[in-house]
From Swiss-Prot:
Belongs to the hssA/B family. The lineage of its organism: Eukaryota, Amoebozoa, Evosea, Eumycetozoa, Dictyostelia. Residues 1-20, 72-91 are annotated as: Disordered. It comes from Dictyostelium discoideum. Coiled coil: none annotated. Transmembrane segments: none annotated. GO terms for biological process: sorocarp development. It holds the Pfam family Coiled. This is HssA/B-like protein 52. InterPro entries: HssA/B-like_chaperone (IPR050533), HssA/B-related (IPR008455).
Amino acid sequence: MTLFSSISSISNPMTSSKSSIASFGSGTSMGSNSIACGGGCGGSDGILGLGLGLSLGLGLGLNLTGGSRSRGGCGGSNGSMGGGNGSCCGI
């Protein structure tokens, strides 16, 4: 059981209501699409996360917004897990 911890501080108008996104997970359920989540998870298609490539994916469903846990729980606007190109943070 490895512990992943990452803090991505991003200041960009594209992040909607998030300028700093912290991702914490413990790699127990890191499967399917959770590993593909960009660390930034900002912008419309995870463009900001593309350069960071932290791929942490919140293994236990812990997220910042209390949203869905289906894909590792990258807290989007309401946990809707938008995107579909590996960016599981739909804003």
